[in-house]
């Protein structure tokens, strides 16, 4: 799996006083879409944070960014395309393309690092095979 399409309705709580989406909300939208991507890739009822070899696994962020192209407003139904821009042994970089009626709204990226999170400090680990085998990088034309 290298891509997922989903949608998100802009709610009142997502907007600022001008009734456009507050810039910070796009990071919430990206995280929700990432979680949907991972749940779909896992396909077995597991949640994004799961146990593997006796340890809790989580996905802290190494890098996030978002570039805004045009405003989204209260009530808009955003189309969100999530694609895997890069899959390393210990991290995944997702690309998020937001659009409204075919017009670009924003583009973002998240690099999530696979880590053991239950102990006193985070430890980056290889993405477990049962997940790594289900995720692949998007073709170059798709990931941009």
Regions found by a protein language model. Give the residues of each.
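Terminal targeting signals and extreme-terminal segments of soluble enzymes
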Residues: 1-77, 85-144
């Amino acid at each position: 799996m290298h891509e997922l399409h989903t949608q998100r309705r802009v709610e009142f709580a997502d907007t600022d006083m001008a009734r456009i989406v507050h810039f910070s909300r796009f990071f919430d939208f990206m995280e929700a879409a990432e979680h949907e991507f991972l749940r779909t890739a896992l396909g077995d009822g597991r949640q994004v944070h799961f146990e593997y070899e006796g340890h809790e696994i989580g996905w802290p962020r190494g890098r996030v960014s978002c570039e805004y192209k045009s405003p989204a407003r209260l009530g808009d139904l955003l189309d969100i395309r999530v694609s895997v821009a890069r899959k390393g042994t210990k991290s995944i970089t997702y690309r998020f393309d937001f659009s409204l009626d075919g017009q670009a709204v924003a583009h973002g990226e998240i690099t999530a690092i696979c880590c053991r999170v239950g102990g006193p400090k985070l430890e980056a680990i290889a993405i477990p095979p049962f997940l790594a085998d289900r995720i692949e990088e998007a073709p170059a034309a798709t990931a941009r």
